[in-house]
A protein has these predicted regions:
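Substrate-binding pocket helix/loop in short-chain dehydrogenase/reductase
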Residues: 95-97, 101-109, 191, 202
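Conserved glycine-rich cofactor-binding loop
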Residues: 9, 16-17
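Short C-terminal tail/terminal secondary-structure segment
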Residues: 2, 91-94, 145, 222, ...
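Short, small/polar-rich loop/turn modules that mediate ligand/substrate recognition or access, typified
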Residues: 172, 177, 232-234
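Residue(s) in the substrate-gating loop at a strand-loop-helix junction
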Residues: 140
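Alpha-helical segment proximal to the catalytic Tyr-Lys
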Residues: 125, 169-173
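Active-site helix of classical SDR
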Residues: 120, 156, 164
């Protein structure tokens, strides 16, 4: 595999499992030294996962103080960060909007939307100073379509898309590119939070008739995070199996 990310440092939030782990593995394979951010980072099996991150940090992305402290520590240790992948997220409960628990709403927004803002807010000044950066935010088809019974998740991911577009315009001449990926449903441990009915309904929307693989997201993210993606910013890359209509 081409080492087109050789010499670059990438932070992947929520990188201990699922989509985040697949992204971390793919960036490492492309030559990047990878920093893993997650709530708990001790349970890492280098043999099973195929590599050892250059740094693993316990970070709560819903806390600006936690994000800022971790980023400062990463810079002190590594000197530079060229790539940020905002992947950390939760689904929240599957329930009608008028019955949605306010505390669950707040938690989903805090992690899935505020977390993206906090990480970008912290990393962007460093990238601007260096005149180079690649930020990839993991959104969702739910953020484009709005999916019934997951109103908080849909709202948060729509916010991620809008934030990405706004910030990308601000940074368009600074060498820092922001894009996001909008996957259809992926087979990951997060499915445990969903009902069988919700899973079946989601699959029925995908013309290809299957769920997305985490590795397919990782392949897309790896290209967006690389130097060959040089004239695209503020864009939403769909991974929908034919579901996307705009």
């Amino acid at each position: 595999m081409s080492q087109y990310l050789q010499g670059q440092t990438a932070i992947v939030t929520g990188g201990m499992r699922g989509i985040g782990l697949a992204i971390a593995q793919r960036l490492h394979a492309a030559g990047a030294q990878v920093v893993i951010w997650d709530l708990a980072v001790d349970d890492w099996d280098a043999a099973e996962n195929g590599f050892e991150p250059v740094l693993r940090q316990a970070v709560d992305v819903s806390s600006l103080a936690s994000v800022e402290a971790a980023f400062a520590q990463a810079l002190a240790r590594l000197g530079q960060v060229q790539i940020l992948v905002n992947n950390a997220g939760i689904n929240g409960p599957v329930v009608a909007s008028w019955e949605y628990p306010p505390e669950a709403w707040d938690k989903v927004i805090a992690i899935d939307l505020n977390g993206v803002f906090y990480c970008c807010r912290t990393a962007i000044p460093h990238m601007r100073e260096r005149g180079y950066g690649r930020i990839v935010n993991i959104a969702s088809m739910a953020g484009k379509d709005g999916v019934q019974y997951i109103c908080a998740y849909s709202a948060a991911k729509a916010g991620v898309i809008a934030f990405t577009k706004a910030a990308a315009k601000e940074l368009a001449q600074d060498g820092v590119l922001l894009n996001c990926v909008a996957p259809a449903m992926v087979e990951t441990p997060l499915m445990a939070e969903m009902t069988a009915e919700h899973i079946a309904a989601s699959k029925a929307k995908i013309p290809m008739g299957r769920f997305l693989k985490a590795e397919e997201i990782a392949n897309m993210v790896s290209w967006i995070a690389g130097p060959e993606c040089s004239f695209t910013t503020g864009f939403v890359f769909d991974l929908s199996g034919g579901r996307a209509t705009y």
